[in-house]
Regions:
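Transmembrane helix-loop junction
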Residues: 33-34, 42, 92, 101, ...
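Selective hydrophobic functional segments
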Residues: 45-98, 102, 186-232, 236
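Alpha-helix N-cap/start motif
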Residues: 39-40, 70, 171, 201
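Selected transmembrane alpha-helices and immediately adjacent juxtamembrane segments
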Residues: 1-39, 124-175
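Residues within membrane-spanning alpha-helices of integral membrane proteins
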Residues: 3, 48, 103-107, 111, ...
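Hydrophobic alpha-helical transmembrane segments in multi-pass integral membrane proteins
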Residues: 86, 143-151, 189-197, 204, ...
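Transmembrane helix exit motif
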Residues: 57-67, 88, 104-129, 242-252
């Protein structure tokens, strides 16, 4: 029964992740509720072992239908991986609890900005080309990769917003690009969790399969309904992140 519950949660998480990120809002609470006595690191590692496959398949699906800026995306993904490793190291040196208190406020500002800019991310008009785009994308990958390793919640949303606001992408193309960087940051985290023995591999396969199925459904929905649909899901996910992080910070 436990495997069925977390596999269904993984499927739904894969669907949401494929559209705009935020699947951890679904899968992690399901894992913690189903296995309350497990070590948190093991549940985080098991979550990554499933979600990385859904994100990877979403990247492939998007690349078949959406132009992927590989020239800027590959360096961004590489630096995202390095940034995630650096962030994971930094969390062993500095207590990240101070950042937890600021996160709901940052997400709130991001949401307000998105809502007030009605046309934000509705049309695809990249602002930069060539080396300039490569450097800005690399900076996005490094900074948000570090954040993912150091703290984590909302990484997908921050990536999408950065591509929309800084590079001029629409929400669909931004989500597609964000997937590649997310695969890299997830790979870094999964490597660390694996080396520390914090992955339940007997759970990983069925959860990964379910996540991939959800990912394929989510990608189809995003491609079918376009940037406006992805924008609406983005707003919903950010609002859910605000509620979750505010509760964890101030009420729990």
């Amino acid at each position: 029964m436990e495997l069925l519950i977390v596999s269904l949660a993984s499927l739904l998480a894969g669907l949401v992740d494929a559209i705009v990120g935020g699947g951890g809002l679904i899968l992690l609470p399901a894992l913690f509720a189903t296995f309350p006595g497990a070590a948190p690191a093991t549940l985080f590692g098991t979550n990554k072992s499933a979600s990385i496959w859904g994100t990877a398949f979403a990247t492939v699906q998007y690349s078949r239908q959406v132009h992927m800026p590989w020239r800027s995306l590959l360096p961004a993904a590489g630096l995202g991986l390095l940034g995630s490793l650096a962030g994971a190291w930094a969390v062993t040196q500095v207590d990240p609890s101070w950042f937890r208190k600021a996160l709901p406020v940052l997400l709130g500002l991001l949401l307000i900005y998105t809502l007030t800019k009605k046309d934000l991310g509705r049309s695809h008009a990249p602002r930069f080309a060539g080396a300039t785009e490569v450097w800005i994308a690399a900076g996005i990958g490094l900074v948000i990769g570090f954040y993912d390793g150091f703290f984590g919640p909302g990484t997908g949303s921050f990536l999408v917003f950065a591509y929309v606001r800084l590079l001029g992408y629409d929400f669909l193309n931004a989500s597609a690009a964000a997937k590649m960087i997310n695969v890299a940051t997830n790979l870094a985290a999964l490597t660390l969790f694996t080396l520390k023995g914090h992955v339940w591999w007997h759970m990983a396969l069925p959860m990964a399969l379910a996540n991939v199925v959800g990912s394929l459904i989510g990608t189809r929905l995003a491609l079918k309904h376009g940037a406006g649909f992805v924008r609406h899901v983005f707003i919903f996910v950010v609002l859910a992140l605000i509620c979750k992080t505010a509760y964890d910070t101030w009420l729990r």
